């Protein structure tokens, strides 16, 4: 078996993470032996680690997800500190989603998109079809009522979707994916937050050099000073990291 089809796991504060070496490893793992894995993908960064710590419901939700991976550079550094031999790298959720969509287009994998504003969702669909010929079997923007959820789950099931990506923000998207899987279990689910906005150019992502240096958080802070309260909250995570309380 190709070594890329398996991956070690690492534990941070009780949360088990998949250790992917790079993007290619992630893709080979998810498409092991030509068979797309089923389950839920959840990106983990320092902010989400704090939420998990403080919110028992969110912790239960995320613990139940099969594929938790290091999306934030702080989490990667913590894994490397706790496990010095770990060959783990950051796999950004936005990049992983694009690579999954490109692979889906190549292989004809059926995709259902959920979330986002109606116009952003429409632009996302059009770009996915034009760029990678993605087989989109259905979509639903994020503006639906709670009483419409069950009908949406049934629609997703009837579509036969093999990949369902949900852009609703945490923890709403994790709750949605958990509940939808009760109706349509045989698919790979991925929570993607604001990825559709980035993909369609409505939100600018940090330049590559900032990403490479692990400073995407600083770029976002400089672009959106209102994030300062969220960033200050991360000092608690840094304390865990530097005191070895991982």
From Swiss-Prot:
One biological process term from GO is:
enterobacterial common antigen biosynthetic process
User: Which is an annotated Pfam family here?
Assistant: Glyco_tran_WecG
Q: Which UniProt keywords apply?
A: Glycosyltransferase, Transferase
Pathway(s) it belongs to: Bacterial outer membrane biogenesis; enterobacterial common antigen biosynthesis
Q: What is its EC number?
A: 2.4.1.180
Q: What class of enzyme is it?
A: transferase
Q: Quickly give the catalysed reaction.
A: UDP-N-acetyl-alpha-D-mannosaminouronate + N-acetyl-alpha-D-glucosaminyl-di-trans,octa-cis-undecaprenyl diphosphate = beta-D-ManNAcA-(1->4)-alpha-D-GlcNAc-di-trans,octa-cis-undecaprenyl diphosphate + UDP + H(+)
By sequence similarity, the record places it as follows: Belongs to the glycosyltransferase 26 family.
**What's this protein's function?**
Catalyzes the synthesis of Und-PP-GlcNAc-ManNAcA (Lipid II), the second lipid-linked intermediate involved in enterobacterial common antigen (ECA) synthesis.
- Output this protein's name: UDP-N-acetyl-D-mannosaminuronic acid transferase
Q: Which organism is it from?
A: Escherichia coli O1:K1 / APEC
